[in-house]
A protein has these predicted regions:
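A short, conserved, highly charged catalytic patch centered on acidic carboxylates
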Residues: 1-129, 137-202
Length: 202
């Protein structure tokens, strides 16, 4: 278990990854490179041990990879196969990394489909939060709410690039790291009732 991974160490690991994967076209166009990158980020930057990671890859037919983190499942990640870039709207809120989901879904079909699909998976699996990514951009949001707001009308934590994630790493760490999920910080950031979190995992 990588529970002892510190914020400083995790940020340093992401900096190394950004330096090593500076060829964006390679990340976008080579599926195995992209999946290896996501694997590294999950383990080295967010402290998830291999024993807490379940991966199902549907590369031929559906064009995405599902990661389930935690036992029971706390995070579901949909990693798109296609070498696409998510078009992102300008941030309208004070926090530049928080964007409302309806605006995200208006920007392009691929992102809308990814958001809708991972939200459905997350709700069915009882995940605390879900992530849609193409390997270099990350959209993080809550698949369910108990405050009366439909989940797809809420807000998402958005990192427009790996460099943007590095610049705002504390925010990413609190949202989807192993220790961040244990402390339920994503709910504070995205404004959901804390009772919607799944049972504590080992």
């Amino acid at each position: 278990m990588m529970e002892n991974l510190t914020l400083y160490e995790a940020e340093s690991n992401l900096r190394d990854i950004v330096n090593n994967y500076n060829d964006l076209n390679r990340i976008k166009n080579e599926a195995e490179t992209r999946f290896h990158l996501i694997d590294e980020i999950i383990e080295k930057c967010f402290g998830w041990d291999k024993s807490q990671i379940t991966v199902e890859r549907y590369m031929q037919n559906n064009g995405f990879t599902d990661y389930e983190l935690g036992k029971p499942t706390s995070i579901i990640i949909e990693a798109k196969k296609e070498g696409i870039t998510f078009e992102l709207p300008p941030a309208m809120l004070k926090d530049k990394n928080i964007i409302d989901i309806p605006s995200l879904m208006k920007m392009n079909v691929e992102l809308k489909e990814a958001i809708m699909q991972v939200q459905e998976y997350g709700a069915k699996r009882g995940a605390a939060c879900v992530v849609a990514t193409n390997g270099h951009q990350f959209i993080i949001f809550l698949p369910t709410n108990t405050n009366g707001t439909p989940p797809l009308n809420g807000n998402a934590l958005v990192f427009s690039s790996l460099s943007n994630m590095l610049e705002n790493f504390k925010m990413a760490w609190e949202a989807i790291s192993y220790v961040g999920i244990k402390e339920r910080r994503v709910f504070n950031k995205l404004g959901s009732n804390i009772n919607s979190i799944p049972n504590k995992f080992s």
